[in-house]
Amino acid sequence: LIYAQKGSGRRSGYYTDYTFAVKKEDQLVTIAKAYSGLTDKEIMEVSRFVTKNSLEKFGPVRTVKPELVFEIAFEGIGFSNRHKSGVALRFPRILRWRRDKKADEIDDIEEVKKLIR
């Protein structure tokens, strides 16, 4: 998780819209945005983390310390110029919060590209 934004409607008080990244050499590059998959309790935990760990803000978006790791499920994957990673996930959603993983254990973009057929 590298960016978060507050949701709308019932979720307007919480950070529920997330942007995720993968490693590309020595930097993090965006690969997907996801809005679903966490429980209400997890959303509250992530919101507290975002509030306490925001590094900068631009408009409604908060850049956060890259410490939380999530597993993302998706329907398809392909090359794209939309994300800095050069890859886009189709219909991404949060599968689970990987509390057992540290940020330096996230996938590298080269591993992700191997999924493209």
Language model features by range: what are they?
Residues 1-117:
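Classical nucleotidyltransferase
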